[in-house]
From Swiss-Prot:
Belongs to the SSU72 phosphatase family. It catalyses: O-phospho-L-seryl-[protein] + H2O = L-seryl-[protein] + phosphate; O-phospho-L-threonyl-[protein] + H2O = L-threonyl-[protein] + phosphate. Expressed in epidermis, intestine and nervous system. This is RNA polymerase II subunit A C-terminal domain phosphatase ssup-72. Changing residue 145 to A: No obvious phenotype. Fails to suppress abnormal synapse and axon formation in a sydn-1 and syd-2 mutant background. It is found in: Nucleus. The modification Phosphoserine is found at residue 39. It comes from Caenorhabditis elegans. PANTHER family: RNA POLYMERASE II SUBUNIT A C-TERMINAL DOMAIN PHOSPHATASE.
Amino acid sequence: MEYSSKLRFAVSCSSNMNRSMEAHGILKKRGFNIESYGSGNQVKMPGPTVDKPNCYEFGPTTYEDIYADLTNKDLHLYTQNGLLHMVDRNRRIKSRPQRFQAETREFDIVLCLEERVFDQVVDFLNRSVGKSGNPVHVINIDIEDNAEEATFGAFFVADLCEKLERSEDFEEDIDQIITDLEENNPKRNLLHTICFY
């Protein structure tokens, strides 16, 4: 696929279901070179009760599998709470949830959508035996895990990506771009660090 962006972006939430997929969809429509991931051990989604989540394995499980499973378990519940709508959106963007720690491709920028995910991604990158030595900028943007915040947050992520993409030298400008966004959005908990592949 041809991308209009020069930078390689990744976006990660915990399960590659809600926040990262909302951002992936918007960035993909805008022509960014974007991939999305989860950083957790499993794909976890709300179940019939708080103590009974629906859990799926990263790797073999497709969004189609998840859609069929939720439909078979309780069509009414998962239609009412929006999960089927969310999974339907996801299967139109890509085939399956992916785990960041299983990815071998390199990115220029990894956007994490909560601090716990940021910590997991940074820990993974710092523990990995580097091959290329290429830098990767890891940025945290806190986005609450619900449909409305995922949408607002995705536009915030897209705004950040557009600013980075337009920069003549994003490596030089990234700190100022983040500082400017943080001043206008103090609740987003923007964090930034550099790791190496």
